[in-house]
Curated annotation (Swiss-Prot):
NCBIfam families: PRK00080.1 (NF000868), ruvB (TIGR00635). Residues 1-180 are annotated as: Large ATPase domain (RuvB-L). It is an enzyme of class 3 (hydrolase). CDD domains: AAA. Homohexamer. Forms an RuvA(8)-RuvB(12)-Holliday junction (HJ) complex. HJ DNA is sandwiched between 2 RuvA tetramers; dsDNA enters through RuvA and exits via RuvB. An RuvB hexamer assembles on each DNA strand where it exits the tetramer. Each RuvB hexamer is contacted by two RuvA subunits (via domain III) on 2 adjacent RuvB subunits; this complex drives branch migration. In the full resolvosome a probable DNA-RuvA(4)-RuvB(12)-RuvC(2) complex forms which resolves the HJ. PANTHER family: HOLLIDAY JUNCTION BRANCH MIGRATION COMPLEX SUBUNIT RUVB, PTHR42848. This is Holliday junction branch migration complex subunit RuvB. Belongs to the RuvB family. Its EC number is 3.6.4.-. Residues 181-252 are annotated as: Small ATPAse domain (RuvB-S). Mg(2+) binds at T65. ATP binds at I19, R20, G61, K64, T65, T66, E127, D128, F129, R170, Y180, R217. The lineage of its organism: Bacteria, Pseudomonadati, Pseudomonadota, Alphaproteobacteria, Rickettsiales.
Length: 329
């Protein structure tokens, strides 16, 4: 029997648990988001009411799961976690909802992957805090309404466009997470280095931040890998910019944070000489379209290396110049 309340986090996020901030005051970056959340949380706590439903959306690795945990801790309520793909039947969701307590946080990761039948059950649960269950079959079928405790649903998605309008509109607090600045990532890296007891110079932290694609999860992953290198190969245990650069090059991460997958993607579009559709790119690279749209493209769009047009993806002159400069083409 599957566990629909099992951890929804990838192994990488589980490794980051010891580094994860527990309170909003410890959370680095996303300052406007943090400031607004403090208001919403304090208001709900003061009124002794459940917080309104929250939708966290943005590229992977920016702290959606971390913020969901923090909301529960700040409100001093229970945290329940599941994921859209785990909820395949109406009974799966009903089992979770009927076991919630008042003001609990229910976190649904990858909420865009809920099937429509499950979504429809959520409508009344979110709006009226009730669950309509059909009992019996055929002419003898009847609807049984079950009252639910007033809870807070926190949904997380990397693809908000895949959410239906009725579901999206039921979230009273939509929150968009942005890519991090270099300065913010440096703080993330320095804080993490202290937690994992690794010495790092300011220049070393900056070198990692410049290649972390504006994403804390990537910054922490690179920090751990560089720590592996320095513990095995160096007597001086301080991560400097020079050592970080050498280690990252060995990992196949260039000075902009691009890896082999990114370069293959850019070269494929460049060699096509025309706007290229996502399905064509997926077929040519043997990559899932979802992975391309969620993992590869957001950062390339941010740094103005590609553009999405109605006719397909187009590589920019800035990207072409970079590919030539680095001898990729």
């Amino acid at each position: 029997m599957k566990n629909i309340l099992q951890s929804t986090e990838c192994l990488e996020d589980q490794q980051n648990v010891s580094i994860r901030p527990n309170l909003l005051d410890e959370f680095i970056g996303q300052s406007s988001v943090v400031n607004n959340l403090k208001i919403f949380i304090n208001a709900a706590y003061t009124r002794k009411e459940p917080m309104d439903h929250v939708l966290l959306y943005g590229p992977p690795g920016l702290g959606k799961t971390t913020l969901a945990h923090i909301i529960a801790k700040e409100l001093k309520v229970n945290f329940r976690s599941t994921a859209g793909p785990l909820l395949s039947k109406a009974g799966d969701l009903a089992a979770i909802l009927t076991n919630l307590q008042a003001k609990d946080i229910l976190f649904i990761d990858e909420i865009h992957r809920l099937n429509r039948n499950i979504e429809e059950i959520l409508y009344s649960a979110m709006e009226d805090f009730c669950l309509d269950i059909i009992v019996g079959e055929g002419c003898g079928a009847r609807t049984l309404r079950v009252d639910l405790p007033k809870f807070t649903l926190v949904g997380a998605t990397t693809r908000i466009g895949l959410l239906s309008n009725p579901l999206r509109d039921r979230f009273g607090i939509p929150i968009h997470l942005e890519f991090y600045s270099t300065e913010e990532l440096i703080k993330v890296i320095q804080r993490a280095a202290k937690v994992i007891k690794t010495d790092i110079s300011d220049s070393g932290a900056q070198e990692i931040s410049l290649r972390a694609r504006g994403t804390p999860r990537i910054a922490l992953r690179l920090l751990r890998r560089i720590r592996d290198f320095i513990e095995v190969t160096e007597h001086n245990k301080t991560i400097t910019d020079t050592f970080a650069d050498k280690a990252l090059l060995r990992l196949g991460i260039d000075k902009l944070g691009l890896d082999r997958q990114d370069i293959q993607y850019l070269k494929f579009i460049h060699d096509s000489n025309n706007p290229t559709g996502i399905d064509t790119i997926s077929s040519g690279l043997s990559e899932d379209t979802g992975n391309i749209e969620e993992t590869i493209e957001p950062y390339l769009i941010k740094i103005n290396f590609i553009q999405r047009t109605p006719r397909g993806r187009v590589i920019t002159q800035k990207a072409i110049s970079y590919l030539k400069e680095q001898s990729y083409i």
